[in-house]
């Protein structure tokens, strides 16, 4: 499942993220959750891709949250690669925030 959060108020975006992840964790057991923020100094888009593509060792469901808060950080995202991977992975809950 892919969910998109769009908004300029960081607090509201993070509140919605929490609500979505809480709902997923309530529905599924032992969820692995990964958080990525493009604004982080050491952000590496490859880690986002790796979190989406990597199969869980114990078959645990996964949630990947990826937040591009500022337009200036969009150049760090390989949109084509993300689109290809997302369209082929149905076993990962992906939350994209812009």
Kindly label every feature range from the protein language model:
Residues 2-98:
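Non-catalytic interfacial helical region
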């Amino acid at each position: 499942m892919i969910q998109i959060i769009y908004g300029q108020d960081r607090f509201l975006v993070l509140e919605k993220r929490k609500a979505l992840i809480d709902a997923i964790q309530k529905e599924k057991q032992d969820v692995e959750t990964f958080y990525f923020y493009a604004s982080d100094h050491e952000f590496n888009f490859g880690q986002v891709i790796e979190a989406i593509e990597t199969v869980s060792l114990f078959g645990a469901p996964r949630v990947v949250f990826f937040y591009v808060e500022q337009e200036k950080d969009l150049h760090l995202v390989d949109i084509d690669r993300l689109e290809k991977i997302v369209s082929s992975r149905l076993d990962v809950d992906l939350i994209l925030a812009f």
